[in-house]
Amino acid sequence: LSLLIELINKLNISNKNNYQGEKMPIYNLGKKEPQLPSEGSYWVAPDAHVIGNVILGQDVGIWFGSVLRGDNDLIKIGNETNIQENTIIHVDPNTPVTIGNNCTIGHNAIIHGCTIGNNSLVGMGATILNNAKIGNNCLVGAGALVTENKEFPDGMLIIGSPAKAVRELSPEMIKDMTRSSKHYVDNFKKFIKELEEIK
């Protein structure tokens, strides 16, 4: 047991609780430490990983299989944003990631060194590359490839590979994106209470 404790100390693994008293997979990397809201106001799934220089806002959900690796620069996730299954978020030196409030990042997305505005939705399997900027209230379609340094204004539907803005979103679609982020806040709170591993 003493050897295990010594190994954990050497790895500098943080000790954050989630459902059923288990440990969330949240890690310091040397002097780079995740900044987290109060316990119960965020959730990191048991097999997701939050590493290093990462800031999580209030009511953020990091879902199964996702990796946020803040080794080279900052990853900042806004309030009530959800990062869905198997998403990869990474940074190069001097290319941080900023994701705004009330965002939905769909399954299997790749978010790398870019900025995503408030209340935006990134569809399943989309890729957004270094120094790209997505405005507020935007929808990046499933499978889209947003290339480096590309910028899009607020309220746009962005699709294709390479991605292009094809039209403005309707007020109804923007409201739907807000509802999506609110739903995922309710959902992670349900998982905190009800998720239990079968022994």
Residue ranges of model-derived segments:
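N-terminal hydrophobic alpha-helix used for membrane targeting or insertion
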Residues: 4-5, 140
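Intrinsic disorder/low-complexity signal
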Residues: 5, 20-21, 46, 58, ...
